[in-house]
């Protein structure tokens, strides 16, 4: 297949403040599936990932451990790369922002922007969030805390360099409006436009003097470059960009990037800061930035103190690499956060991998061995039922291509497994064991087994981008190779009289939850013990079980209502498609909520708990038929349901499983 041209894609580079959990690992697996699929389609792919290794947070972490920042990031970067390799990811370049070539170019870029007048020297006095490496004004805080992560901010006053963001704002707005594919999903675009660009951009602080772990400004070395100007530029520096005009052939071939794949929490940096930096450098903008959702443990953020952090290597130990890949790819919706629990992983392993796929391959090969000594042959004895099987199998390629073109990877995997589901149905329809009892139907039996083997061979090739090791194993057991893209809509390419393996390997043996869950509990216990040891070593108070698991609250009972009273209330699942802070209020958010075919505007007092960015894409429970009322002068047409603890902390109620917007709550 001839090349369709270049495809340069990147993940966000992982921040080296600690070991990545499964939610972080999801991104590299997602990127790998996209990269493998693009190669299958015929693209010349260059896939870059790596680690972000500078900043105050890392300096403080290293200080806590009594080692240098470089020693600290060397350890964490090594761990990140180990996990990326464990997950069988096919990146072409693993970058580190402490690499000498990157640091050299960052200094040049800073100087170039300074000489151009886009960076100027001033002084900063305001507020700084160390975990987010972000600057904020008082008006941007939510209840006095960082609007991104909810943590405390610290006063900061220092000499600093600033970038003239407002100079390029109108140009960026025009680009976003004329390139609807630039920010995906669309809900992320709406966030950036409504919450940042349209209200107006402030100049950005791009240097610090209060810590030293960073790339020094070449002409003013008491300053270090702000971590985001450092980190974002890796996408060009590590493919050979040179600010002096001597860029490499690799850069000239691959820039602009075709895809930046990032978490939704850092989309602001990639769709506002980064394109403006590129405009200032007179470079073209990336073609698309996709902000993927988060993977949450049982609907809540992972915490070492709770022992609920899930790491990729623990999942691999229990389920294997491809089963881990399958879960994170299959369970993540396009826009909404995904849910992971150990119990759900076991359920998917047994139902999808062991039953639908593994059992199909094993049964088919076993029947070929039992009835024909492993020889697979098409006899031409066809029946009407064969046509539908062939249509499903040969039609899958284009359906998957359509899903992958929109980065709907979970939907693409579902299409692959629809091939295997159709094969299982075909076995039930043709009943090979019945055909085997009648010698006159031997040729028909041979045709049935050929059709199954050919379908599985095509299915394995379609599966290869997502579960590469499993695809290779299936092809090996069928004694054939994986096919190219142009062959995946053709039926009948499996060689006649080919022989399958005599002893099929069990791809995925069913798991007994009673055996798995004790191992999970041991992992949780080890995590909590490690966390407590870390807390004690750093002199911090260890959170007690009672504090962590305060599980019950009694509230004042209200007057009883009748069943008829209750039935007057209409509850439905809603999907938040836009959200912004209500002006002149520190508590209120205004959300546009899709409920079925209609969109309602709902004002909620949850600004303390959620940022507008976090809200977009959530599926929530809504009281739909509440009489409209104005809150802080803004019309509200319903109510989002929340739970409240004894401290007044609120948490939105969300469906346990992904449900369509408009589904009735009953």
Q: What is the predicted role of each segment?
A:
Residues 2-76, 95-110, 115, 132, ...:
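N-terminal catalytic cores of NTP/NDP-binding nucleotidyl/phosphoryl-transfer enzymes
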Residues 542-666:
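Phosphate-backbone binding interfaces of nucleic-acid-interacting proteins
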Residues 116-169, 173:
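Cys/His-rich short segments
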Residues 2-49, 101-105, 149, 155-370, ...:
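Structured secondary-structure scaffolds
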Residues 121, 331, 343-381, 392-500, ...:
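Helix-rich, typically C-terminal accessory recognition domains appended to large enzymatic cores
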């Amino acid at each position: 297949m001839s090349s369709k041209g270049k495809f340069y894609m990147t993940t966000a580079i992982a921040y080296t403040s600690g070991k990545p959990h499964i939610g972080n690992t999801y991104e590299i697996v997602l990127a790998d599936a996209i990269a493998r699929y693009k190669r299958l389609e015929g693209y010349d792919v260059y896939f870059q990932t790596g680690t972000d290794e500078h900043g105050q947070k890392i300096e403080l972490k290293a200080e806590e451990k009594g080692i240098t920042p470089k020693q600290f990031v060397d350890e964490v970067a090594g761990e990140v790369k180990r996990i990326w390799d464990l997950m069988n990811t096919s990146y072409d370049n693993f970058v580190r922002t402490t690499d000498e070539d990157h640091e050299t170019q960052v200094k040049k870029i800073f100087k170039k922007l300074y000489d151009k007048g886009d960076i100027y020297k001033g002084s900063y006095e305001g507020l700084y969030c160390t975990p987010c490496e972000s600057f904020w004004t008082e008006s941007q805080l939510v209840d006095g805390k960082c609007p991104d992560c909810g943590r405390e901010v610290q006063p900061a006053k220092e000499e600093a360099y600033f970038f003239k963001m407002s100079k390029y704002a109108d140009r960026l707005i025009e680009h976003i409006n004329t390139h609807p594919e630039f920010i995906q999903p669309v809900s992320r675009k709406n966030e950036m436009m409504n919450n940042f660009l349209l209200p107006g951009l402030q100049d950005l602080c791009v240097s610090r003097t209060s810590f030293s772990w960073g790339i020094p400004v070449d002409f003013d070395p008491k300053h270090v470059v702000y971590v985001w100007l450092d980190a974002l530029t890796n996408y060009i520096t590590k493919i050979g960009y040179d600010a002096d005009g001597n860029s490499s052939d690799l850069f000239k071939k691959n820039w602009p990037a075709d895809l930046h794949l990032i978490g939704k929490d850092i989309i602001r940096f990639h769709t506002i800061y980064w394109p403006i930096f590129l405009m200032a450098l007179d470079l073209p903008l990336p073609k698309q930035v996709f902000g993927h959702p988060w993977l949450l443990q049982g609907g809540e953020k992972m915490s070492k103190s709770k022992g609920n952090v899930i790491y990729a290597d623990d999942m691999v130990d229990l389920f294997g690499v491809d089963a881990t890949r399958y879960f994170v790819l299959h369970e993540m919706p396009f826009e909404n956060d995904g849910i992971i629990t150990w119990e759900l992983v076991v359920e998917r392993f047994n139902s999808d991998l062991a039953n639908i796929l593994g059992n199909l391959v094993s049964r088919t090969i076993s029947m070929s061995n039992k009835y024909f000594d492993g020889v697979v042959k098409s006899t031409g004895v066809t029946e009407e039922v064969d046509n539908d099987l062939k249509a499903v199998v040969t039609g899958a390629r284009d359906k998957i291509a359509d899903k992958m073109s929109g980065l709907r990877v979970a939907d693409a995997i579902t299409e692959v497994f629809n091939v295997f589901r159709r094969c299982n149905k075909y076995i039930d329809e043709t009943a090979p064991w019945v055909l085997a009892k009648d010698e006159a139907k031997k040729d028909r039996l041979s045709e049935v087994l050929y059709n199954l083997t050919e379908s599985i061979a095509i299915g394995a090739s379609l599966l290869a981008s997502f579960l590469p090791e499993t695809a290779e194993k299936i092809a090996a057991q069928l004694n054939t190779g994986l096919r190219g893209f142009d062959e995946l809509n053709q039926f009948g390419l499996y060689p006649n009289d080919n022989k399958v393996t005599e002893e099929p390997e069990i791809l995925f043996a069913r798991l007994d939850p009673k055996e798995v869950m004790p191992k999970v509990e041991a992992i949780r216990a080890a995590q909590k013990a490690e966390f407590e040891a870390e807390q004690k070593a750093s002199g911090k108070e260890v959170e007690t079980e009672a504090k962590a698991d305060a599980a019950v609250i009694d509230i004042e009972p209200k007057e009883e209502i009748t069943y008829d009273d209750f039935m007057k209330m209409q509850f439905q699942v809603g999907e938040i498609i836009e959200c912004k802070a209500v002006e002149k209020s520190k508590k209120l958010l205004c959300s546009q909520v899709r409920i079925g075919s209609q969109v309602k505007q709902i004002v909620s007092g949850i600004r303390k708990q959620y940022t507008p960015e976090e809200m977009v894409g959530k599926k929530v429970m809504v009281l739909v038929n509440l009489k409209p009322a104005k809150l802080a002068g803004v019309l509200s047409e319903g109510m989002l349901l929340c739970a409240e603890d004894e401290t007044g902390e609120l948490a939105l109620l969300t469906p346990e499983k992904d449900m369509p917007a408009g589904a009735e709550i009953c």
